[in-house]
Amino acid sequence: MKIKIRKTALLLFAVLCLTGCSEEKLNDRSVIDDSKQQIETTQLDNWILDNITKPYGIEVVYRWEKNTGSTGTFIHPPKLKNIRAILEAVRELGLETYRLKEVGGTDFLLGRLPIKLYLYGGGNPDENGVERLHNPQLTAAEMCLYNVNSFNPGDADKMFVLMRSVHHQLAKRLIQLIAYDRDKFFTISGHRYTGSTESIAAPLGNAHTGKEKFGLDAYANKRGFYTMLSFLSAEDDFAEIISATLTSTPKEVYDATVTAKTPDTDVDPEVNARYAKEAEQAYKEFTEKQAFVNEYVQKNWHINLKQMQVISVRRINAYVKQH
């Protein structure tokens, strides 16, 4: 009898459970999507769509995506309050400078821009502690902006770093799509390329400001380069010449040329003779690459780089003063 009562009770319990399940409404949202936060479109999203994505074809990614940072970098999401400000600067001083009538013209960038732009709150030091202007693990079709959280359009040093990064990455994209004679360019300083920041970490150890880290550098000049990051590869060297030119005055570039050809001195005549030969070689490489890039930009982009330099620097300075 007890066994019958127990079986009856279990059967009744099962029926009640099935009835409850049939009355419960199913959630129309897929369980596959539950791991992802439901994102609502914001005013910032609409501004980005209208001012960056639609006119330039660039998708801006500012929400956290854990898989988009390179291994070993210290990155975190950007503060929302700075995103529009940094994108406005990129648009005005980077993209629109190229589109000026006296530079490349309205249609110059069509189909030639990165298709995705990632924003990060902090910097991008690599395994050697050297800050980078881009993410070397990404292709030239993808672009990154760092230090969004500390960006201030009225700070000349922060604006300098931003535009160095923007022009470096735009140059990388353009030389990817509009080919240059890499083999010929490589022969000029190919013996100096390191492929790593290990050898430049020590010379950069005392650099603190953006200008000190990314500006024209005497150590680099005396070895035939514009900047410290030029040592990494032919592509970096090429892009750095363009980027450094568009963010430096003609006098600053001229002074770098003088530095390249000025030998160090020593009390030992033999050492002095060696220094003189090193300076002669550095100057030769510096000016050959400078001429190579100027000719390439003129012939293939139909842009006078020196004229664009003056325009770019004036626009950057005016923008900083306005903010």
PLM feature segments, named:
Residues 1-10:
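Bacterial N-terminal signal peptides that target proteins for export
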Residues 194-266, 270-277, 281, 285-290, ...:
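Metalloprotease/metallohydrolase-associated module, dominated by Zn2+-dependent proteases
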Residues 97-121, 177-186, 252-262, 304-312:
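Surface-exposed patches in mature extracellular/periplasmic domains of secreted proteins
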